[in-house]
Amino acid sequence: MNVEAVQQYQHRTVLLEEAVDALALDGERANGMYVDGTFGRGGHSRLILQRLGENGCLLAFDKDTQAIANAATIEDKRFAIVHDSFATLSTALAERGIAQVNGVLLDLGISSPQVDDAARGFSFRADGPLDMRMDTTRGISAAEWLATETEQKIEKVIREYGEERFAFQIAKAIVAGRAVQPISSTRQLAEIVARAVKTREKGKDPATRTFQAIRIFINQELEELEVVLNEAYRHLAPHGRLVVISFHSLEDRIVKQFMASKANVPQPDRRLPIRAVDLPQPEMKLIARIKPSAAEISANPRARSAVMRVAERLPTPGAAS
């Protein structure tokens, strides 16, 4: 992979300082073990490395071969990257003999270079092959999936992952369109969707929700998010931080519900004769919910929908922290 080609697509890391600040890399924690589950173009990872102590370590993940090529430019013995999904966190840690980490950062969604590179097939704004895979070395492309999937399944994906109210009409149009000719380009799909959607949302292309839905499905984004949240929690040391940046409501809902399930423990009836020490205890503490500043949104409009949630693992009652 040509690194110069990687760098031609500019990317601004969203909530850069805020996310790394949330990991609390100070004092003894600076020499801890950290995970960047989504290396991307390395904005968060590079800032984490700047703040890590001499004995600190950072393990990053990414499915995108361009991201892996970019990571190869980092010459730092404290850094390693895995070319795989962050959902393989437990396996990667076990292979390295690591039981606990002090912080996990997940910057979800799709990066600007992926969107802006027409050859990746993520965007309807420029014509390109209908691919949409984060990892182009494995799995099936969006074009391959649309060529064979049932109308009912296509509708379900667009409705659930795109929250698209015209999912029925769009799926029907896709199946009718592929009967005439294979749907192999982003422009073809965008035009089919535009013809099927009779009304318009102000400031939003009619293909936006459909492209989001198919991308999420092809890359199993929500399923992998649920896996990594549980794996991250399991490996967090006491007072370890989980920092997650989401870019749409489906992701944020999963993150919010997961953190709430660990922080808000149902309590039994107070009238029952249960000792305080035997009451269910919260496993995490909610630290923050942060949105980008007006200044950041002005400089980078793609940050507008970002939401960052931070939670900290609590020590087990009675255990040394």
Curated annotation (Swiss-Prot):
One of its GO terms (molecular function) is rRNA (cytosine-N4-)-methyltransferase activity. It is found in: Cytoplasm. The keyword Methyltransferase applies. GO terms for biological process: rRNA base methylation. Keywords: Cytoplasm, Methyltransferase, rRNA processing, S-adenosyl-L-methionine, Transferase. S-adenosyl-L-methionine binds at G42, G43, H44, D62, F86, D107, Q114. Signal peptide: none annotated. Its main location: cytoplasm. Its EC number is 2.1.1.199. Specifically methylates the N4 position of cytidine in position 1402 (C1402) of 16S rRNA. This is Ribosomal RNA small subunit methyltransferase H. It comes from Herminiimonas arsenicoxydans. The gene is rsmH.
